[in-house]
Amino acid sequence: MSENTIYSGLKQLGSHTDIPLTPEEAVLERVANPQEGTPYCVRFTAPEFSSLCPMTGQPDFAHLVIDYVPGKWLVESKSLKLFLFSFRNHGAFHEDCTVTIGKRLVDLLEPEWLRIGGYWYPRGGIPIDVFYQTGAAPLNVWIPEQGVANYRGRG
């Protein structure tokens, strides 16, 4: 493999990287999209996302689904994983966590389109689902439903 590739600037992939202590210090990395100009959808699913309630410090859990139609850039998946892990000890409400993740990705990638669904497990008996997207979905790309069922409990 040649010395200078689209992966040459990556700092985290292929090496030991500590989990960032906060989302603010987490470094998201991107690589050039080798299929730029071809409309397609990328999906990341994080079924065990966690953060902390900013009031009680109790853990909150969510199933996240991130879909995006890339332009020039792709997110490097290890850096995304570490970014999501950085929320483990971060206190914020469900809405803030979900939208912050979406906006950080938009700022980094400048995608054609992005959406994130945060399907939060109940706290205080109420599940909270949070949805953010950059605009109408492109018509020329297959974008599957997120497929996360409404919370039912034992009912």
Swiss-Prot record:
Its EC number is 1.7.1.13. One of its GO terms (molecular function) is preQ1 synthase activity. Gene3D superfamilies: 3.30.1130.10. It is an enzyme of class 1 (oxidoreductase). Pathway: tRNA modification; tRNA-queuosine biosynthesis. GO terms for cellular component: cytoplasm. It catalyses: 7-aminomethyl-7-carbaguanine + 2 NADP(+) = 7-cyano-7-deazaguanine + 2 NADPH + 3 H(+). The keyword Mitochondrion does not apply. Substrate binds at V75, E76, S77, H94, E95. It is found in: Cytoplasm. Keywords: Cytoplasm, NADP, Oxidoreductase, Queuosine biosynthesis. Transmembrane segments: none annotated. It comes from the Bacteria. One of its GO terms (biological process) is queuosine biosynthetic process. Pfam families: QueF. The active site is at C53, D60. Signal peptide: none annotated. Belongs to the GTP cyclohydrolase I family. QueF type 1 subfamily. HAMAP family: QueF_type1. Catalyzes the NADPH-dependent reduction of 7-cyano-7-deazaguanine (preQ0) to 7-aminomethyl-7-deazaguanine (preQ1). This is NADPH-dependent 7-cyano-7-deazaguanine reductase. It comes from Brucella abortus (strain 2308). The lineage of its organism: Bacteria, Pseudomonadati, Pseudomonadota, Alphaproteobacteria, Hyphomicrobiales.
